[in-house]
Amino acid sequence: MKTNKYLFIFAFILFSAQNILAQETKINKTSFDLINLDYKGLEKVKALVTAKKYEDASEQLLKYYRGRTDVKNLDFNNTDRQKYAGKKVSDNTLELANDILLHKFKPHKGYPAYDYGKDINWQYRPVQDQLLTTFLHRTAFWEPLGIVYNSTGNETYAKEWVFEVRDWIQKNKQGAYPDDKQYAWKAFVVSFRLNHWSSYFNMFINSPHFTPAFLMEFLNSYKEQADYVMNNYTDIGNHRLYEALHMMYAGSSFPEMNHAETWRKSGITVLNDEIKKQVLPDGVQFELSPSYHIGTIKIFLDALQIAQLNGVEKEFPESYHNLVEKMILAVGKYSFPDYTFPLYGNSFLTTKSAMLKNYQVWTKVFPQNKTIEYYAADGKSGLKPEYLSSSLPNAGFYAFRNGWDTTSTVMQIKAGPPAGFHSQPDNGNFVLWVKDRDFTPDAGSFVYANVGNQENSKRDWYRSTKAHQTLTLDDQNIQNDAKLIKWQPDGNLQLLSYLNPSYKNLNHERNFLFVDKTFFIIIDRAIGTAKGDLAIHYNLKEDSKASINSLNNSIVTNYSDGNNLVIQLLNKDKVTLKEESSFVSYQYQKETNRPAFVFKKPKNNELTQGFISILYPYNCNKPPEIKIIENKGHDLSNGKIDLTLTINGKINQIQQNLNP
């Protein structure tokens, strides 16, 4: 059966590529308009162009590129093929490459490979997710062809790549279809294509199927695309950063082109400008997404590396370096001891190994920073931070913690300003991590792109306020614009207090108390004239086997290892406790059901209503006995907290004035 499969593949390739020579574009003088013929090393090319021997000139130009070693690509260089030659590739990579031969493409890992047809239909949209189509036009899915080609030397893979590049160029000219600026000619997408194509150029340059005619077609298309990005930068956000970085890639990958220096300088100018706009004073990128924050660090550092390769590092000022260093330190503040972080703002779950690799790159850039070294060495060298609880006040990221190792208790909290596209209406949301367990993971995003103006119910649910650990009115989404009231990160009674204008005529004041560096009390106040059903939501880890006790309004996890959590409402007024539907998504297009619960009470008048919750981690299979006495001075509606809290016989006096 496998033999028949490969016979079919090669028959398919012969059919697809039978007209490849007929596609060869006639080479003339204008073919060289994009080349700086005075560039060092192109003397023979210039002489042949001057002599009007254009075919010979293109052959000489190809010879130049095949022998070029002074231009370095961050991903794949001409000389790298020696590392791949004869090296066994993974079964998955080989399968992907062979599928590409059949025009079965897998642009995004969240979806299977789809058949785009013998006559490739670049407009085929098999699912209602615009991300899949934009990833198709980034063309990163071609990489397995290059890897397998450089491993095996089998020209079938190179021939198919040349064919598909030509097919893409022919069928995706600007204006070829009405919404091309949302897909193939979206500047953000084009910029990624430039980046990938510069690597593929090196992967396939030595193939006999990479002809002089194809070289000129490739370079002319590359020039058109780079000029397009430079003239169509996205106005704001991480897209603009990626576009600028990829313009630097373009300029450094093909310095022989007339516009190369303009492209490179354009990228540097944008990055120098945008780092001041997009990075808040506390070091967090302004879209407030932990994953995208790390992505922007890579953008800024890749730009520095490209500048170093081109001898123009000084075009990035010291302030640029300092901000990137601050960005790296911010990652440690919003992370847990296992190097993961909350999935705020369309983030997806990372791994410790991935983050250690990041830190090992970062510590080489900032070798004098002992805190970055500490993270990079997994605590074996360097210096751990001098603080425990910490804040990133401009982003509204706060962390209570009692240590830096995996036996620690850490609560990460989001209470920030309005943010960009990736931000979700989730102020007040928190993630509680105790002894290497994330008890209340953020929901994640599952999917974060719609198709045009079409709604996506999954995207809407994952973005919704009720999917997060915070307060809602009638389960509607809130607006984010938190204002800090008080932050006290030291001592045995630590406090975070903020006010958020969640709804029209309803402000949400949330107060987090970290008691004895052991447990938490959350005090919510709904202030304003709005009426409706108030609720506070608790979404727990999918394997927690959580259960409820309606008699004392408590939720308990049931882990067999004894590392458990009880959440109990301490209100004396009538509150209902119910289970609700919830999910968590750690990877794109993958989700898991999880236990979730909601405490509800009506707000029928203008009086302030409140909730008082305790989150108590414990180390056995029996939850602690928690009792509360409201003392005479206790008046939640007026911001006066005076409670006597008894936990397994230990008495805690909790007194706090919540008024500014």
Regions found by a protein language model. Give the residues of each.
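CBM-like, beta-strand-rich accessory domains located in the C-terminal region of large
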Residues: 6, 347-348, 352, 450-660
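Bacterial Sec-dependent N-terminal signal peptides
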Residues: 1-24
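Extreme N-terminal leader/anchor segments
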Residues: 23-106
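Short alpha-helical hairpin
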Residues: 103-123, 135-136
